[in-house]
Amino acid sequence: RICYNHLGTKPPTTECTQEDSCYKNIWRNITFDNIRRGCGCFTPRGDMPGPYCCESDKCNL
């Protein structure tokens, strides 16, 4: 599975292992007018909260 990332600070594509899943996170600043979306690999053993499937953002491909 390949997850496509939309954040410039991470690789554009990330290989996920079989037990990993894709997640989507949304960052907003204090005035809620700066929204950045990112996709990546999530493993249940990690500490990333709230994994979300984001097929519209080309995750879970």
Swiss-Prot record:
A single GO molecular function term of this UniProt record: toxin activity
GO cellular component: extracellular region
Domain of life: Eukaryota
InterPro entries attached to this UniProt entry: Snake_toxin-like_sf (IPR045860)
Keywords linked to the UniProt accession: Cell adhesion impairing toxin, Disulfide bond, Hemostasis impairing toxin, Platelet aggregation inhibiting toxin, Secreted, Toxin
Location of this chain's protein in the cell: Secreted
Motif Cell attachment site, chain ranges: 45-47
Organs and tissues of expression: Expressed by the venom gland.
Primary localization: secreted
Disulfide bonds: 3-22, 16-39, 41-53, 54-59
Sequence similarity: Belongs to the three-finger toxin family. Short-chain subfamily. Antiplatelet toxin sub-subfamily.
Record's function text: Inhibits ADP-induced platelet aggregation and inhibits the binding of purified platelet fibrinogen receptor alpha-IIb/beta-3 (ITGA2B/ITGB3) to immobilized fibrinogen.
Protein name: Toxin S5C1
Organism whose genome encodes this protein: Dendroaspis jamesoni kaimosae
